A protein has these predicted regions:
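Glycine- and acidic
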Residues: 27-36, 112-117, 189-194
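Active-site-adjacent bridging/hinge elements
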Residues: 17-28, 175-188
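Soluble non-cytosolic domains of exported or imported proteins
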Residues: 37-45, 125, 196-199
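Soluble metallo-hydrolase cores and metallopeptidase-like ectodomains found primarily
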Residues: 1-41, 48-62, 69
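His/Asp/Glu-rich mid-to-C-terminal helical/loop segments that flank catalytic regions of hydrolases
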Residues: 52, 68-71, 180-200
Length: 200
């Protein structure tokens, strides 16, 4: 039995407030309406953990507050973010963003692939190169078994935020891909927490 009805999805927004230019924002997007552990409880969890770690380090005096505001957004894939961008009043659109979708897979699940997909071609491509540099530097410090793979833009719904209609580059970071195809449990009940790398 199926019935149609009008519902709603929440858009959750959290900030790490910028110090010098707080009106300038960098966004971290992770869709929240899919039920899988990797796709995409992982992206939402990373947003929460990033905000917690950054605010903790700032409070302890170990790092300065970032120059620009970092906004973490969790919403229904594609539609929640676009509705937010079209209806929430702001002085300007974000400078850049990143889409966190399907992360944290054990290297055995994703063949050790950490994938960085470019923003949509007509947006500012420098963000692709900065992100690639940062990821390579991070993997050089500590690496649980990943190799960075870069690739061209893939329209995953959320990455379309880079369209000039919205006006900011938004690459995609993921462990979605394997050497051949995508991880085995993609969009299935097999997408469970035991497929995710433990933080210990």
């Amino acid at each position: 039995d199926v019935r149609e009805y009008v519902g709603h999805h929440d858009v959750v927004s959290g900030l790490v407030q910028g110090g010098a230019d707080p009106q300038d924002e960098v966004w971290v997007l992770a869709h929240s309406a899919e039920p899988g552990a990797m796709d995409n409880a992982s992206g939402v969890s990373i947003c929460l953990e990033m905000a917690r770690i950054l605010e903790g380090l700032i409070a302890d005096g170990k790092i300065k507050r970032p120059r620009r505001t970092i906004r973490f957004l969790n919403a229904y894939e594609c539609y929640g973010f676009f509705h937010y961008m079209e209806h929430v009043k702001r002085l300007q659109m974000p400078l850049a963003g990143v889409c966190l979708d399907t992360l944290g897979a054990k290297p055995s699940v994703c063949d050790g692939r950490l994938t960085w997909r470019s923003t949509i071609p007509m947006s500012a491509g420098f963000v692709d190169r900065i992100g690639e540099y940062m990821l390579q530097a991070t993997l050089a410090l500590e690496n649980p078994g990943y190799t960075l793979h870069t690739g061209p833009f893939v329209p995953t719904s959320d990455t379309l935020a880079g369209d000039p209609k919205y006006g900011f580059p938004c690459p995609w970071l993921s462990t979605h891909y394997r050497d051949e195809g995508v991880f085995d449990a993609y969009h299935s009940s097999g997408d469970t927490a035991d497929e995710i790398l433990s933080p210990e």
